[in-house]
């Protein structure tokens, strides 16, 4: 049997895929074209992701593959999928599969070389009106510090230089929400001497002054704040059930920017076209983003998802209008990023060389924040070096090492 794995969706899904791969012998893992069997780990978070997942399943079936499907789409629509696509096998636990030889002592197979994600929890206890994740993944469940340290040691032995901590609500680790438990975990991980530790998905309400101070004084935790605000209008934030106000956001950003030892890098993401979003709310969001408080901005069109609190609202904003608002925010975010990158020209930055001709700066998370091109090829990869920025190429950078 030759088996290929297709991962769709977020970094948390990638960790799941890598763990599933660990149940198979390396020699059985193959490219898509050589494989007779395909395992697809789906995303079912929003409409676009659901369409992509279905398309991948049907393509693999059409290509004559034996298809096994798992992930959020299966957790959410397993019965419907089994009825509509009987050619595929849909599963929630790899150990439930019959007729496939699995290793008894699985070891996670990394698909990335110099960085890896450490998923510290599953599920979410938040009640955001637009989000289906609690329905799909269940309530928040944390892994123990001991289990995570053991996994991190394994990743370190595999040559990982950057450890990226992820979950649906990272600072809610061990259902503490007062930052103390996540600090205990970070203390334990710092002892392993990863050069870079990055945290993703920081819920605004959970970012305390003490946590900010910890980042400011940490030797390896990067001053990278990924804070998905979703909106800035108080009307929309209240309807979204986010639990904070515009004033709270500005107070938080002021605290972060008051760091004494490090210069913070901020990323956020926003939803446009939410059912109750009026033009004035959208203009308020544009004005907020235009203040250039964030280095990186992600934007998504609202997806009307059954089972969510917001599903009771009339999804009245036309698709064309959602697309217009999306394009305005996206274009603005790209302009801001180009300006911020231009300001880096002539400065020295720390980079992780991932390939002979490219790298990432400490302020760039994989896949979403752009890349760094090397003017001259590096003979070594997997090393962190100082580099001088000599140009910005759109939203990317060119450096001399």
UniProtKB/Swiss-Prot annotation:
A Pfam match = TRAM_2
Q: What does this protein do?
A: Catalyzes the methylthiolation of an aspartic acid residue of ribosomal protein uS12.
Q: Could you identify this protein by its name?
A: Ribosomal protein uS12 methylthiotransferase RimO
- PANTHER family to which the protein is assigned, alphabetical: RIBOSOMAL PROTEIN S12 METHYLTHIOTRANSFERASE RIMO, RIBOSOMAL PROTEIN US12 METHYLTHIOTRANSFERASE RIMO
Residue span, Radical SAM core domain: 110-339
Can you tell me which family this protein belongs to?
Answer: Belongs to the methylthiotransferase family. RimO subfamily.
Major enzyme class: transferase
Q: Which gene encodes it?
A: rimO
Q: Which reaction does it catalyse?
A: L-aspartate(89)-[ribosomal protein uS12]-hydrogen + (sulfur carrier)-SH + AH2 + 2 S-adenosyl-L-methionine = 3-methylsulfanyl-L-aspartate(89)-[ribosomal protein uS12]-hydrogen + (sulfur carrier)-H + 5'-deoxyadenosine + L-methionine + A + S-adenosyl-L-homocysteine + 2 H(+)
Organismal lineage: Bacteria, Pseudomonadati, Aquificota, Aquificia, Aquificales
Main localisation: cytoplasm
Residues annotated to bind [4Fe-4S] cluster 2: 124, 128, 131
Keyword Metal-binding, does the record have it? Answer: yes
The record's listing under InterPro entries reads:
Elp3/MiaA/NifB-like_rSAM, Methylthiotransferase, Methylthiotransferase_CS, Methylthiotransferase_N, Methylthiotransferase_N_sf, NA-bd_OB-fold, Ribosomal_uS12_MeSTrfase_RimO, rSAM
- Single Gene Ontology BP term? tRNA modification
């Amino acid at each position: 049997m030759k088996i290929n794995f297709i991962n769709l969706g977020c970094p948390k899904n990638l960790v799941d895929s890598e763990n599933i791969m660990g149940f198979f012998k390396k020699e059985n893992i193959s490219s898509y074209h050589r494989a007779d069997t395909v395992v697809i780990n789906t995303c079912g978070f929003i409409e676009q992701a659901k369409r992509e997942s279905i398309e991948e399943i049907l393509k693999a079936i059409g290509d004559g593959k034996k298809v096994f499907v798992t992930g959020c789409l299966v957790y959410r629509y397993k019965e419907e999928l089994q009825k509509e696509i009987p050619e595929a096998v849909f599963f929630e636990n790899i150990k439930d599969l019959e007729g496939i030889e699995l290793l008894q002592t699985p070891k996670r197979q990394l698909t990335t070389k110099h960085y890896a994600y450490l998923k510290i929890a599953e599920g979410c206890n938040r009640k955001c009106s637009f989000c289906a994740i609690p329905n799909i993944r269940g309530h928040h469940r944390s892994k123990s510090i001991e289990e995570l340290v053991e996994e991190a040691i394994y990743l370190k032995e595999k040559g990982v230089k950057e450890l990226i901590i992820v979950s649906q609500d990272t600072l809610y680790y061990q259902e503490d929400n007062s930052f103390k438990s996540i600090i205990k975990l970070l203390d334990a991980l710092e002892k392993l001497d990863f050069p870079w530790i990055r945290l993703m998905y920081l819920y605004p309400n959970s970012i305390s002054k003490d946590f900010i101070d910890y980042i400011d004084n940490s030797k390896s935790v990067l001053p990278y704040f990924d804070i998905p605000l979703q909106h800035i209008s108080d009307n929309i934030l209240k309807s979204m059930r986010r639990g904070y106000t515009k004033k709270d956001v500005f107070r938080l950003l002021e605290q972060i920017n008051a760091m004494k030892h490090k210069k913070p890098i901020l990323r956020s993401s926003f939803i446009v076209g939410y059912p109750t979003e009026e033009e004035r709310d959208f203009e308020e969001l544009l004005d907020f983003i235009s203040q250039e408080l964030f280095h990186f901005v992600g934007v998504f069109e609202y997806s009307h998802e059954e089972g969510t609190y917001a599903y009771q609202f009339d999804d009245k904003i036309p698709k064309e209008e959602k697309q217009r608002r999306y394009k305005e925010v996206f274009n603005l975010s790209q302009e801001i990023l180009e300006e911020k990158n231009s300001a880096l020209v002539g400065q020295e930055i720390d980079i992780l060389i991932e390939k002979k001709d490219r790298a990432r700066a400490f302020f760039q998370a994989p896949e979403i924040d752009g890349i760094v091109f090397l003017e001259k090829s590096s003979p070594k990869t997997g090393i962190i070096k100082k580099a001088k920025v000599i140009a910005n190429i759109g939203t990317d950078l060119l450096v001399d090492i």
